[in-house]
Amino acid sequence: MKTLIAAYSGVLRGERQAEADRSQRSHGGPALSREGSGRWGTGSSILSALQDLFSVTWLNRSKVEKQLQVISVLQWVLSFLVLGVACSAILMYIFCTDCWLIAVLYFTWLVFDWNTPKKGGRRSQWVRNWAVWRYFRDYFPIQLVKTHNLLTTRNYIFGYHPHGIMGLGAFCNFSTEATEVSKKFPGIRPYLATLAGNFRMPVLREYLMSGGICPVSRDTIDYLLSKNGSGNAIIIVVGGAAESLSSMPGKNAVTLRNRKGFVKLALRHGADLVPIYSFGENEVYKQVIFEEGSWGRWVQKKFQKYIGFAPCIFHGRGLFSSDTWGLVPYSKPITTVVGEPITIPKLEHPTQQDIDLYHTMYMEALVKLFDKHKTKFGLPETEVLEVN
């Protein structure tokens, strides 16, 4: 900026000198200085100043882009962690002020709108196409890989693995259009299923529904698979809170062996099962892992049992530097590979034998998907997917 001001000052001095020369000539005298304008300020000095100005660090385009990416990720992390509680507290505060009518109107609306999330919510293509999600995608970056076509005449249950700390790949790929899920799977409506408790939080519920996120409850899944036509894809992060407790960089493990409820739902509705593995999901946060039997793991399991989620002690990088700790995830590639659908028959009353059969088929398909693609995304041929 100082360079620009100096150049501008030079131009002014040059103009004043030129004006003095013209005045001197009009009175018959010689010009005071023919080199004045060239010496004091020219168009080239302005150009040089502008080049210097736009080369300064704070206006570097790539750095601005990177900071926008960091901010876009941080806003989602904060929304995930505190938006619901913060909005609840703000509304309660407003209720105690002269603006109490705003809180009353919203809570009245909430009563009438309470069951909307169970019916798929209010998807907004405008929100799903926000530019902020493209910055979110590019930060890691996140990529969605399609391996097979999906029929719009069928319904699907996608099993997403692993959970990671926040399921960032699941959110970006299926609750936004940043990776063009609607173009890669035309005619398929993705619904990312998450904890039902999130939809009891004011404002947060509206934010989640706008992205096509719904409660991971039997009522919701039954409705979407039986009363919402065809072409629905419900994404369930099968490992849930239990799987998040073992999330750490370098570890490829899923909690699946005793998770059979999603298979039973698929059989009851004749919805095809689609295994998904997200390479890199576990790499973006570091976590303190408590040993089995420790007080820390006991607390986590109690939270998981009674509240539905397990609190994790984790960290990423800082807002302004990757060398400090903070809530911003590390910039590691996340590649989500959507596998081949497993055709599931419709059985109104599936037996345990039926459930076990298709559950085994699903586990085998997931391991096969992992083995087929692992070397493409930086894992050695010897890497084995741990199924717990």
From Swiss-Prot:
Predominant location: endoplasmic reticulum
Tissue localization of expression: Predominantly expressed in liver and white adipose tissue. Expressed at lower level in mammary gland, testis and peripheral blood leukocytes. Expressed in sebaceous glands of normal skin but decreased psoriatic skin.
Region of interest (Disordered), ranges: 16-40
Activity regulation annotation text: Inhibited by niacin.
Keyword Transferase applies: yes
Protein's GO biological process: cellular response to oleic acid; cholesterol homeostasis; diacylglycerol biosynthetic process; diacylglycerol metabolic process; fat pad development; fatty acid homeostasis; glycerol metabolic process; intracellular triglyceride homeostasis
General function of this protein: Essential acyltransferase that catalyzes the terminal and only committed step in triacylglycerol synthesis by using diacylglycerol and fatty acyl CoA as substrates. Required for synthesis and storage of intracellular triglycerides. Probably plays a central role in cytosolic lipid accumulation. In liver, is primarily responsible for incorporating endogenously synthesized fatty acids into triglycerides. Also functions as an acyl-CoA retinol acyltransferase (ARAT). Also able to use 1-monoalkylglycerol (1-MAkG) as an acyl acceptor for the synthesis of monoalkyl-monoacylglycerol (MAMAG).
Protein name listed in UniProt: Diacylglycerol O-acyltransferase 2
Species this chain originates from: Homo sapiens (Human)
